[in-house]
């Protein structure tokens, strides 16, 4: 009898242990997928893009576009090129998309992103002028039937912005039950003869969150390299990703501002992060630090503060090496600061390593302009390509 019970017990253990392991692994897998879908900015989310995010998430490309007026047509705002924009004839002026042909399952919640050609992310910090940049505006939706002209009434305002001083903004909008979406600009920030609204505008399916979304903070090199217009024959970062990994088409903002150092980044980072609902935050400060030969310990501590701010916001920091340049200070101090970035990688394993811009430009010195600091136009295009290549390999798991 005892022998029979012993055999029965062993049989139960043989069956039960694998079952427990299977159930545990299944639960963990489901939990991870739920986190990726339901909380894409969770600190527990790994660096790779969730499989659920696809290029189909960009739902506004070539959708019927309409505008109140325009020096340039509404269709310029959502065509295949970021080199073209819609430009109003004065303000108020609106730009509307008919999304009625998009499956309703892909537009119950959307991400609206608009981009303006003003070079600096926040031009007020360094006193530069804006260029036809929306300052006061609303995002509106409408349940009216699609397939024709925009509705004359019944617009529902779902986001209101006043006093904007950024050249791009993002808004997560609940659009369930609606077919139309528009931006209505009532005031513009610009200079003489540049007081029209001029933008590109993308709309993404945000049903599964907004994991495939990037912002690149940095200095004038970031500003020159990570905008949307073609630079040095190279298209925008998002288009480069899509060209090599057609499943994806990331939302992307350039957060570059001329003259800024890592200390300036620390000053503004928390304010900026509140505006950015996405996942990946590139931190590309250091050229101005190196050119001023700042104390390496201070530089490192600034970056620690930046990384902690990004992690505390539930996002993922992405950090490259400082680019090589010809100035004596950068050549002398740059390696010391890049060594601190290497230390940062070890201290914070959550960091995704960006491109080694020092090695690249040191090996391609002809891509540095006559000011000995900034890339040439072709160099800016190469800078952008280096970013895309690095992220294709690291994040999108695509060979380049």
Predicted feature descriptions by range:
Residues 49, 187-255, 270-277:
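Serine-esterase "nucleophile elbow" of acetyl-processing enzymes
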Residues 92, 101-111, 178-179, 209:
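Extended extracellular/luminal ectodomain segments enriched in beta-structured repeat modules
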